[in-house]
């Protein structure tokens, strides 16, 4: 059951009126610490805040050596870039939106003045289709933050993520979902 793989890595976000998006967000740890990433003003985009990322990476540990990570529905890519900054073995960011994908590439190019310790791939694909093509237990840490307005997307992504997640190395599945839903509703 994927329930065991989520552990305590669950964050809820409030639906409703979207707060003002920051123009820039910063990497908070690792080799890219304090580096700024530009943020698109894109409908449905909700960058994970510094405070939430700090909590997540305190749970995970500051050093992700040996972990293979996926950042699904990557948006700003900040979760994936944080993992890469903290020495993840590999990080794959998946984004379907053409503008968000282009911004991911631009932000990564800026970060490359200090190369990532591991492999970073940014793919312009549908996250669900990508997941379906992956082998069982092929990733250690999976970030899932889908568009909230697309019903059923979260549950489908979780089912596939549970299949490919190998959490034996200390990883797991991190999920962002609307505060209007309970954890039981997505399990």
Predicted regions and their residues:
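Class I S-adenosyl-L-methionine-dependent methyltransferase catalytic core
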Residues: 1-187
């Amino acid at each position: 059951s994927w329930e065991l793989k989520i552990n305590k890595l669950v964050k809820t976000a409030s639906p409703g009126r979207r707060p003002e998006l920051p123009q820039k967000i910063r990497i908070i740890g690792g080799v890219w610490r304090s580096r700024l990433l530009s943020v698109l003003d894109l409908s449905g985009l909700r960058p994970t805040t510094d405070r939430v990322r700090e909590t997540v990476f305190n749970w995970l540990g500051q050093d992700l050596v040996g972990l293979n990570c996926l950042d699904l529905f990557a948006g700003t890519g900040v979760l994936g870039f944080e993992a890469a900054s903290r020495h993840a073995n590999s990080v794959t960011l998946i984004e379907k939106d053409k503008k968000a994908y282009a911004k991911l590439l631009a932000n990564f190019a800026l970060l490359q003045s200090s190369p990532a310790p591991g492999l970073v791939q940014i793919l312009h694909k549908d996250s669900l289709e990508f997941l379906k093509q992956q082998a069982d237990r092929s990733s250690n840490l999976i970030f899932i933050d889908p568009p909230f307005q697309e019903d059923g997307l979260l549950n489908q992504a979780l089912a596939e993520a549970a299949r490919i997640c190998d959490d034996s190395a200390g990883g797991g599945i991190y999920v962002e979902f609307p505060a209007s839903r309970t954890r039981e509703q997505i399990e």
